[in-house]
């Protein structure tokens, strides 16, 4: 009886808190929070390619849609993403490396890049991930989720950060995980303290 009551109280407490859960499929931790409430920011987006790519555009479209609608993602910051055929506020582009580099002097053919309102996902990284993730055995699926959330974070007004989350050691989504984890645990989703939007 007492054990049952304690269990119920513990469940109630956990349901109110922002907690860290293990993704058993991929064997690493992601941050989860309660559903966001308040004013919803609606962002339309379209999906295109640029240059000669080896990746499949429809697969890219599907992963983008799944990532942007995932309850662990930017929806927790009250952002609702809706795909449109053209004319979106956000343009998700699977781009050849040379096209990424040509988008801005601040972009590189080695990485993905955001030049608002365009998010350029580097085709090489899309297909091969990054050394920082591959060396730890993190799946390509979770690398793709991370890079989409990171670059969309720039569109939402975020800059880069360089420190792990204090209590969990997780990498913030705005840490440049493609170039190195700086001792943090890999993480594909925005942390609770990153759930804000500016300038859109």
Regions found by a protein language model. Name each.
Residues 58-145:
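Metzincin-family zinc-dependent endopeptidase catalytic domain
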Residues 135-136, 150, 154, 166:
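Compact recognition or signaling/catalytic modules
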Residues 15, 39-41, 86, 113-115, ...:
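A short, polar/charged loop/turn motif at coil->beta-strand junctions and beta-hairpin connectors
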Residues 141-160:
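Active-site recognition of the HExxH zinc-binding catalytic motif
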Residues 2, 108-111, 115, 119-123, ...:
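Metalloprotease/metallohydrolase-associated module, dominated by Zn2+-dependent proteases
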Residues 51-54, 74, 97-101, 125-128, ...:
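Solvent-exposed loop/turn segments at secondary-structure junctions
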Residues 5-53:
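Disordered inhibitory propeptide/activation segment of secreted metzincin zinc metalloprotease zymogens
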Residues 44-46, 91-93, 119-122, 155, ...:
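Structural recognition of the beta-strand scaffold that forms the well-ordered cores
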């Amino acid at each position: 009886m007492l054990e049952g009551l304690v269990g119920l109280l513990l469940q109630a407490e956990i349901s109110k808190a922002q907690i860290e859960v293990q993704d058993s499929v991929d064997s690493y931790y992601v941050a989860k929070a309660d559903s966001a409430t308040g004013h919803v920011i609606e962002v339309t987006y379209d999906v295109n390619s640029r240059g000669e790519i080896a990746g499949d555009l429809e697969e890219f479209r599907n992963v983008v849609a799944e990532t942007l609608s995932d309850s662990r993602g930017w929806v927790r910051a009250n952002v609702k993403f809706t795909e449109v055929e053209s004319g979106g506020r956000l343009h998700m582009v699977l781009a050849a490396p040379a096209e990424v580099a040509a988008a801005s002097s601040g972009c590189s053919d080695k990485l993905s890049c955001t030049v608002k309102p365009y998010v350029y996902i580097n085709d090489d990284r899309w297909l091969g991930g990054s050394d920082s993730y591959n060396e730890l055995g993190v799946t390509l699926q979770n690398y793709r989720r991370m890079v989409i959330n990171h670059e969309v974070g720039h569109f939402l007004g975020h800059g880069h950060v360089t420190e792990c989350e204090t209590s969990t050691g997780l990498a913030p989504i705005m840490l440049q995980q493609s170039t190195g984890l700086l001792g943090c645990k890999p993480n594909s989703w925005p942390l609770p303290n990153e759930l804000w939007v500016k300038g859109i």
